[in-house]
A protein has these predicted regions:
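Membrane-embedded beta-barrel scaffold of Gram-negative outer-membrane proteins
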Residues: 465-469, 473-479, 483-491, 671-731, ...
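Gram-negative outer-membrane beta-barrel transporters
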Residues: 715-801, 837, 857-861
Length: 862
């Protein structure tokens, strides 16, 4: 394994483009300049006198927020204005490539006043210009791109004391298309530019006319790379600065792959497998051999049914995460990040139809509710009506998610989000992990035709952000989730020796209610100790879950032939049951992100949790358990050259066992520890990112049978998971995007009183890989035509750890074709093109997956 790591590291270093030094031009504070009397050349000279080197270095450490982008029509074309709230200094590097004029602005980010990132795009704003985009190129750089239809557009650069940086873009229809040439500056052309590239020279500003018009905010991100994420640190941290593997599946990948079950997005991440359950409804994802924890916008969530109607991106943090999120398995967590309100209007409608009577419609509306744009909203609504390749499965799902954000002041905002889900679902429990079931038709459902699962959820999320000053801010959030379920579910039972008869089919169900409460408060401070920079996070979390189940259960009379099924057998009911449980978690955590040197960063933190659990049947005295655990994490990142990050980390996790020994003593929580080292790289001018990780996880204190009394448990079991992973995502060349992964994993029982040592963990393949790539034609008559293809390989794996059935490996092949023009898009997605037969599993059951399916989508944006 180490040999493979060294070879992979060598490969990544070899393919990295040589680091290029670029000349940077600083723009002075806006209030110090006079747009009407100074040219760019003159105020560049002024900057050299006013900003000595030490001041410049100080500014470079601060990321300037550009809070708005506007476009004003002019007699030449259009002016694009990047507005800052405090008039801070900005830097610019201009170049041209092909038909594109490109400006990079280091130490700057597009951020709404509430801190959310945003993207701007205008299609065909003027004659001769096909597109203007303003995006966060990476975690510390804004990129402005102006694409010409026939050649490089003519762009001039100004600064305004009242507005910000201004890019004047000339129309090809303008009589003043060719500007008067200005004297060349003495600054050399940045190294690394092609011979045909040139640095655009500034001229006097053009006159403004008419009323300002704002560029349209792009509601959907169109990149495969995301430069930063909050899951790993609870702060917006560049992925390259995190000493743990974290992968982000952005909205564009979800859209290109035609994903309708949001957990399918994790197929693109190394070391993950889907663990289906309850008719492919439960969204359990195995990460590095363990069940993952689930978050929704950073709050603990249940994986039972996850609607993707308002999901912006999916973040997968690998390894233990108890340091910030409390009790969880050591493999990792999945965070579903929802869409936020935007300051400019954006409206989208999606209509999807597919095989097996699949129909889904969705709308996404956002924009301001007030003229001053202090009150913003977003509304996501979707409706799905679908059949299935499995018998007796019909689904009817309504999802509504409104969000409102109010900017109380420059330093305070409040967001109120609500989600409503009503799902009436057919039910499918799959079959037992027995090889005979692998030969039955894929459509066979052992459940009864009248089995059902009804779900109703209400989720309320209130978030407050307050900035005391530039160095201290508060974030506080409260979540309430109400879950109501009712069901009638058939259990498949065991198969007789004849390989075809089920004699012990049973059923269960009944109403279930759960109320979830969660409160998180984080205080984030930035300060220095000498030359060392700190970002300190102090947080408190409290959450409670109350659940009550009123169960019905029984058995079916007679036998069931899986090759000649007969449904409608009489049910013999058992007495009704009642079960209730309450879990209360209180956690306090501290984290410090330390910049020792510009290229050397330390992450250290710890969390202490108190967990109370009680359960009962409403008649006898409840069973109670009290646990506490401390979960530390420490990691370091070293960046020898700008594109490369070398990292190492140690992290830990815990899970309460809620059991007692024969002597009556409670079992200690199971503990997980991980050691991880890796390399992160940003290639092709930061358009492509790669992560190579090697890890070793040990989980201890696992309950296993007491050899002296088999009615009780002792916590001496141990399992291990170790492996190597590679993830790649980004844009190789204009229009050609890729997301790929590969991994080797060895997850096995290392100590147990019941299971043999070396037994593989359930649903943990020894190897897997994925590749999805798309290409969209960038110019010419076919501009907007896109094609995509994907391969998803999963190695063989154990379906059940007690009586192992090996599920065969498979390679699923997908493809897509799309056409995008102006504000509409049409797409066809082909899934499982070669109609292979493959399976997903959880710890107890196996589920056949869909054959070849065709799905078509029409999307319109306004």
């Amino acid at each position: 394994m180490l040999r493979s790591l060294f070879i992979s590291c060598f490969f990544i270093v070899v393919i990295i483009q040589p680091t290029q030094a670029k000349e940077v031009t600083e723009i002075s504070r806006l209030q110090e300049l006079n747009r009407s009397t100074r040219t760019v050349k003159e105020w560049l000279a002024q900057i050299e006198q006013q900003n000595p080197p030490d001041q410049g270095e100080k500014q470079e450490s601060e990321v300037v927020q550009v809070t708005s982008v506007k476009a004003n029509p002019t007699d030449k074309g259009v002016e694009v204005i990047l507005q800052t709230s405090l008039g801070q200094e900005l830097q610019v590097v201009n170049r041209s490539s092909g038909n594109n004029f490109i400006t990079d602005i280091p130490n700057a980010q597009l951020r709404l006043p509430n801190g959310d990132a945003f993207t701007f795009r205008s299609t065909k704003p003027i004659a001769g210009v096909s597109e203007i985009t303003v995006t966060n190129f990476d975690a510390q750089t804004i990129r402005v791109s102006v694409t010409g239809e026939a050649g490089v557009p003519i762009v001039e650069l100004f600064d305004s004391p009242d507005e910000g940086i201004i890019f004047s873009v000339a129309s090809s229809a303008s009589s003043a298309q060719q500007p008067q040439q200005q004297p060349q500056t003495q600054n050399p052309t940045p190294s690394g530019q092609s011979e045909g590239s040139q640095q655009t020279q500034p001229t006097q500003p053009s006159a403004q006319s008419d009323e300002p018009i704002e560029l349209v905010v792009t509601g959907e991100q169109d990149e495969y790379t995301v430069p930063e994420a909050s899951t790993a640190t609870k702060t917006d941290t560049p992925l390259r600065d995190i000493p743990q593997s974290i992968q982000v599946i952005p909205q564009q990948v979800i859209r290109d792959q035609g994903i309708t079950r949001i957990t399918d997005a994790t197929r693109n991440v190394s070391g993950t497998t889907l663990a289906s359950g309850y008719g492919n409804l439960i969204g359990d994802v195995r990460v590095r051999g363990f069940s993952s924890g689930f978050l929704r916008d950073g709050f603990a969530s249940q994986p039972f049914f996850i609607d993707g109607g308002n999901i912006e991106q999916v973040e997968v943090l690998k390894g233990p995460a108890s340091v910030l999120y409390g009790a969880s398995e050591p493999g990792g967590i999945v965070n579903y990040v929802t869409k936020k309100p935007l300051s400019n209007p954006y409206y989208a409608v999606d209509l999807t139809a597919g095989s097996y009577d699949f129909y889904k419609s969705a709308i996404d509306l956002t924009g301001p509710l007030s003229n001053d744009k202090l009150l913003l909203y977003r509304l996501n609504v979707s409706y799905e009506n679908s059949g299935s390749y499995r018998d007796f499965i019909d689904n009817d799902i309504v999802f509504i998610a409104p969000v409102v954000t109010y900017q109380v002041s420059d330093s305070t905002d409040i967001t109120l989000a609500y989600e409503y889900l009503n799902a009436k679902l057919g039910f499918d429990r799959g079959f037992r992990p027995v090889s005979a079931f692998l030969n039955v038709p894929r459509n066979l459902n052992i459940a009864e035709p009248d089995d059902f699962q009804d779900i109703e959820q209400h989720r309320l999320n209130l978030t407050l952000n307050h900035r005391f000053n530039q160095n201290l801010r508060l974030r506080s959030g409260f979540v309430y989730l109400s879950e109501k379920q009712d069901s009638l579910v058939t259990q498949p039972g065991e198969l007789d020796a004849d390989g075809r008869t089920l004699t012990d089919r049973s059923y269960f169900g009944g109403p279930s209610n759960a109320d979830n409460y969660a409160l998180q408060t984080d205080l984030i401070g930035d300060f220095k100790t000498g030359s060392i920079t700190h970002q300190l996070l102090l947080g408190l979390e409290w959450r409670k879950r109350d659940q009550a189940d009123r169960g019905i259960s029984g058995v079916y009379e007679g036998s069931f032939d899986i090759f000649n099924p007969a449904y409608g057998l009489p049910r013999i009911a058992d007495p009704n049951s009642f079960f209730e449980q309450t879990t209360i978690t209180t956690g306090i955590y501290l984290q410090d992100q330390v910049t020792l040197l510009p290229n050397l960063k330390l992450l250290a933190g710890g969390r202490y949790d108190f967990v109370e659990y009680s359960s009962g049947d409403g008649q006898s005295a409840p069973t109670e358990f009290y646990d506490s655990a401390f979960s530390p994490r420490i990691g370091i990142v070293y960046q020898p050259i700008e594109p490369i990050s070398l990292y190492a980390s140690y992290s830990s996790s815990f899970v309460p066992n809620n059991s007692r020994t024969a002597s009556g003593e409670p079992l200690e929580p199971s503990r997980g520890t991980q050691y991880e080292v890796g390399i992160k790289a940003e290639l092709f001018d930061k358009r492509l990112s790669a992560t190579l990780a090697v890890y070793d996880i040990t989980k201890t204190n696992i309950p296993t049978t007491d050899p002296d009394d088999d009615e009780f448990l002792i916590a001496v079991g141990e399992v291990k998971s170790r492996g190597i992973e590679l993830d790649i995502a980004g844009e190789i060349s204009p229009g050609w995007k890729v997301i790929a992964s590969g991994y080797l994993n060895d997850a096995f029982v290392s100590k147990d009183n019941n299971l043999p040592e070396g037994r593989r963990l359930t649903n943990a393949p020894t190897q897997g890989a994925s590749l999805w790539t798309t290409y969209e034609v960038q110019k010419g008559d076919l501009r907007g035509l896109g094609i995509g293809a994907g391969l998803f390989f999963v190695g063989d794996r154990t379906a059940n750890i007690d009586d192992p059935l090996t599920l065969p490996s498979y390679v699923r092949t997908d493809a897509s074709i799309s056409y995008k023009r102006d504000n509409w898009r049409a797409a066809l997605n082909f899934k499982n093109i070669f109609n292979i037969k493959y399976y997903e599993s959880n710890d107890f059951l196996v589920f056949p997956q869909a054959p070849f399916t065709l799905q078509g989508t029409i999307s319109v944006e306004f």
